[in-house]
Amino acid sequence: VPGIEPSIKFPIHFGTSGFRGRWGVEYTEPVVRTITQAICDYLLEDGLAGKIVVIGYDSREYADIAAEWCTDVVLGNGFAVHLTSRDTPTPALAFYAGEVLAERSAGVINCTSSHNPVEWHGIKFSLRDGSISPPRVTDFISERSTAYQRSELTHAPTKQDPGHPEMVDPREPYCQWLLDSGETDCRISLDHNRMRSYFADKLVIVDEMHGTGRGYLRTILDIIGVPFQVIHAERDPRLGGLRAANPEEPHIQLLKETVAKTGAVLGLGLDTDADRYGIVDRGGSYIEPNAVLAMLTRYLGVERGLTGCVATTYVTTHILERIAADIENNDSFRPAPGSLPMHRRDPDYKVVRGAPDGMVTRNVFTVLTGLKYIIQVPQMARDYTLLDDPPPDWRCRLLIGGEQASGLTSKGHVPDKDGIWASLLVLDMVAYFGTSLQEIWRETQSLYGGSITAPINLTVPDKHKAPFIDSYLDAGRDGRLAGMAVVFAGGIPGKYAELMLEDENGNTDNFLHIRPSGTEPLIRVYLETSSELAMNALRAKIDEDAAAI
C-alpha cells in the first residue's frame, strides 16, 4: 500500500470534520497513528479508560486499512474496540455508540473524508453519545497531535496483550430504529401507511453513489413498501469515477437523468458516508438544501404542530425566520428578544456598517457553519448562553436543525448529520402534501415570501483568501456593492464577512456571506436575494472579483 512511508512533519489541524488530507501526502500511517494517539489521550484524561471505542470507515480505497491502524493504537491504549465489518454510514456509527453501547461507549473514530474527492481521506472523532466533537475537544486533539509530530512520538504505548477488536455491523438495528422513530420517544414519527399508499404506483430513485449508505434506504423502503430503483449501487473504492460522491450539482447528473427518464417522482442521493442528502424532484429538478430545510420546517412545525428550536447556520435561507414565526406554542423555543448569536459576540467580530441587531432573528437560532454548532442550540439558554449542565433530554428540545451544505438532524435524533433520515423525512412530507416538491416549494414561497439562493464555490489560493474576504468588509465601509446600498456589514477580518443589502426598490432581503471552507481549498460564497435582478448583479460582482485574483 502506498503512503505509509514516514511523513513530512507539519502542524495537524483537527477541525469540525476532523483531519483531512490526500492519501500518501498529508494522510499517512504515521499521521493517522499520531492523531489516534491524541484521541486516546483525550479519552484517558476524560476518565473513559477501558470503555469501548467504535471504529468505522467509508467506502473509498484504503479507508479500511486506515481503520486497522486506528484499531492497533486504540487497543494498545487499553480500550476495547468494536470495528465495523464493512464500510458504515457516519449516522449509523453515532447511533451504535449512543443508543446501543450507551454508557459502555467511549467515542467513535471514523476514517472518512465524507463528500470529498476520492484521493482525500479523513479521520473524525465523535463523543460517546455520537455527538460531533465541540471545539474544546478538537482543539485538544490538534494541539496534542502537533506536539507528537514535533517530538516524533507517533506510536501508541502497546499493551503486552492488547487483544482483538469485536466485529460489528449496525445496519439492521439502525434501520429498525429509524422505522420505529417516535413510537416510544420524542423523535419524529413517520406515517408508514400514508407513504405506502401514496407511493404505491410511483417510483423513487435511490443514488447510493458507491458509498456507505448501500443497502440502508433499500432496506427501509422495502419494509415500508415504497417502490424504488437504485443507481451507483456497488461498492467501488474509486467511487465509480465520480469526481466526488457529493449529492449536489454537478455531481448528481445521473440521478437527475434517471428520475427524468423513468418518470420517477423523487430521487434520493447520499454522499460517501451518508451524512449528506441530495433531493431531485420529478422531471429531474434538483432541490436546493435551503428549500428542503424550509419545506420541512413548515411541514413539521406549522402543518404537524410539532414544537422545538429551529436551528440553522447564518448562511441558510431567511425564509426560515418567517416560517418559524408561524409555529404555534413555540415561544419557549425561540431566541430571547434582542439576543445576539454567539459568532457576533466574538471579540474579533467587527461591525463596519449598521447595527448587529438588524441581523437578529426572532424565531430561529442562527449559528456558525457546522452541525457541531447546531447541536449546541438545544444545550443553550434562549440568549445563546451554553448551559453548564444541559437537561438530559436536550436532544428533544430541537425541532429541526440544518445547514446549506445538506446537513440535517431533528428532534431526538442522532446529534450529527444524517442523510438517510433526511431522505425519509422528505418522503414522509411528500406523501403528506400529495404533490411534487416543486409545487410544495411554490406554495411555501407564496405563503412566506419568495427568495432566491445561490451557493458559489471559488478556488482561491491560500495567500489570497483573507484579502478576498476582507474586500467585502471594505465594500461595507464604502456603503455600496453591486449597485446596492449596504445596510449592514460585519465579520471577522480574514475569516468571514456578512452583508445585508438594499436594492433600488427598498427591499433589504438581500444577503451575502463569504467564508473559507474548513475542509476544502475553497472560498464559499452564499447569496440570497429577493429578485433575479439583485442575484444577477451580485453574481456578476463575485465573478468579476474572482477573475481579478
Located regions from the model:
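Buried hydrophobic positions in well-ordered alpha/beta secondary-structure cores of metabolic enzymes
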Residues: 17, 55, 93, 109, ...
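Gly/Ser/Thr-enriched, mixed-charge loops and adjacent short helices
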Residues: 2-9, 121-259
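Conserved phosphate/anionic-ligand binding catalytic regions in large, soluble enzymes, centered on
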Residues: 12-25, 113-114, 208-212, 216, ...
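An N-terminal, well-structured beta->alpha segment
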Residues: 1-72, 76-77, 163-204
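Phosphate-binding and adjacent anionic-ligand microenvironments
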Residues: 120, 265-266, 306-549
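N-terminal small/polar loop signature for handling phosphorylated ligands or for N-terminal nucleophile
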Residues: 49, 54-120, 219-279, 346
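Active-site nucleophile and cofactor-binding loops and adjacent substrate-binding regions
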Residues: 81-91, 286-289, 312-313, 365-369
